[in-house]
Amino acid sequence: MADVSQRTQQAVDTAMAGAAEMSRYGRRLLNMLWDPEPTNDRSLNRPVWCLGCSYTNEPTTVDRPDQDASSTVRATLPTTPSTTTLPYPLKAVPTTPPESSSSSFSSSLAYDELLEDAGWPIAFLDDFESRVWMTYRSEFEPISKSNDPRASAALSFAMRLRTLADQGGFSSDTGWGCMIRSGQSLLANTLVICQLGRDWRRGKAARQEREILARFADDPRAPYSLHNFVRHGAVACGKFPGEWFGPSATARCIQALANSNESSLRVYSTGDLPDVYEDSFMAVAKPDGETFHPTLILVGTRLGIDKINQVYWEALTATLQMPQSVGIAGGRPSASHYFIGAQRSGDAYEPGSYLFYLDPHCTRPALPFHEDVDQYTSDDINTCHTRRLRRLHVRDMDPSMLIGFLIKDEDDWDMWKDSVKYVQGKTIINVADHDPARGMPAEREAAIDEVETLKGEFV
């Protein structure tokens, strides 16, 4: 009787899991069927940000001396988008200016007369397209399934059905690899900025770009392949092949793989807490106490229960406006995105901002691994970039996420500390001098010894 009851409960649990899964896929199908590309209302002239750079359609006005040098001519350069980065030292993270109080007839025309760029600054689109976009892939060397009896229960309902039909392992990560792909995107763009510079755009340094992308090929020989993320996830994070990764597991994989394969980049991870400790950070960035190595900070955090608490909206948006930003991996439950841009909402009655993201939920053939990167075709490289904009209002984001920052030197570190401290709303990252887990600094211990000695003298 107990066995019957247990089987009944298991059947009910499976049915409920299946219903929830079908509901989620139904919403995703609806989004795919109705997913118009966002447009930009030029009349509001709201800045749009991409990893610390701001773009507008506002005409640029320059001062230049007239030929007789007796007056100044103000020359307007129409349709030239401006690109700026945040100043140093940063005492407050700039936010986009407030919206106009209401829409106008001219603003409605901006949507009726759509241009090829949909109203977005061309420089912003070029920047967005130059960011590396990692997506689901198929037809790669199969990743073996786990023989652990707990593995099946860890998989989603859809993946359990798929494994029943296919006993040969996972030759595609569709349905389970989106957080890994978001993490790959974050790491790949960090390497691009480190090695090619923040101003790099598609069409420049093509061979160096191929060398970076080859490290993310869908092959065990590539250091940052899906295969190696899954392998380390199984060893260090208790994640089974085919199981969805969370921000914490993704951060641990990035840290381990990068520290093993990159001599020019270090990784500092906060784990599941938003606390950054300067002594621990410097131990990673300056292991010899002298030479500072560019260091990727990964902050794992949760900013609410089901949705992001509104008190964190401004601070979260501000992270994408910081020059050190390399994006956010997160999004929706079991449906991660890679966020790289932001723009304040154009509705005067709607607070908050829209965040622009690269969506990994698009399955393409596996990116091959080539020792000779000149063998990569243009089609191979094109699958790692997109000009198609997608955005999500901050209120609709999942509160669990992984936030990345690239600190290039000590000046960058000082600037970043100010950036995360002086934000509107409630701060989401805490910076402290000493990590309690590292024990008390030697000078602090000596000071306490002195106090104890003095105390003994007065007894």
Swiss-Prot record:
GO cellular component assignments: nucleus; phagophore assembly site
Name the record gives this protein: Probable cysteine protease ATG4
Function, in words: Cysteine protease that plays a key role in cytoplasm to vacuole transport (Cvt) and autophagy by mediating both proteolytic activation and delipidation of ATG8. Required for selective autophagic degradation of the nucleus (nucleophagy) as well as for mitophagy which contributes to regulate mitochondrial quantity and quality by eliminating the mitochondria to a basal level to fulfill cellular energy requirements and preventing excess ROS production. The protease activity is required for proteolytic activation of ATG8: cleaves the C-terminal amino acid of ATG8 to reveal a C-terminal glycine.
Residues the record marks as active site: C178, D359, H361
One Gene Ontology biological process: autophagosome assembly
Pfam family, one: Peptidase_C54
GO molecular function: cysteine-type endopeptidase activity; protein-phosphatidylethanolamide deconjugating activity
InterPro entries per UniProt: Papain-like_cys_pep_sf, Peptidase_C54, Peptidase_C54_cat
EC nos: 3.4.22.-
Keyword terms of this UniProt record: Autophagy, Cytoplasm, Hydrolase, Nucleus, Protease, Protein transport, Thiol protease, Transport
Catalysed reactions listed for this entry: [protein]-C-terminal L-amino acid-glycyl-phosphatidylethanolamide + H2O = [protein]-C-terminal L-amino acid-glycine + a 1,2-diacyl-sn-glycero-3-phosphoethanolamine
Repeat recorded as keyword: no
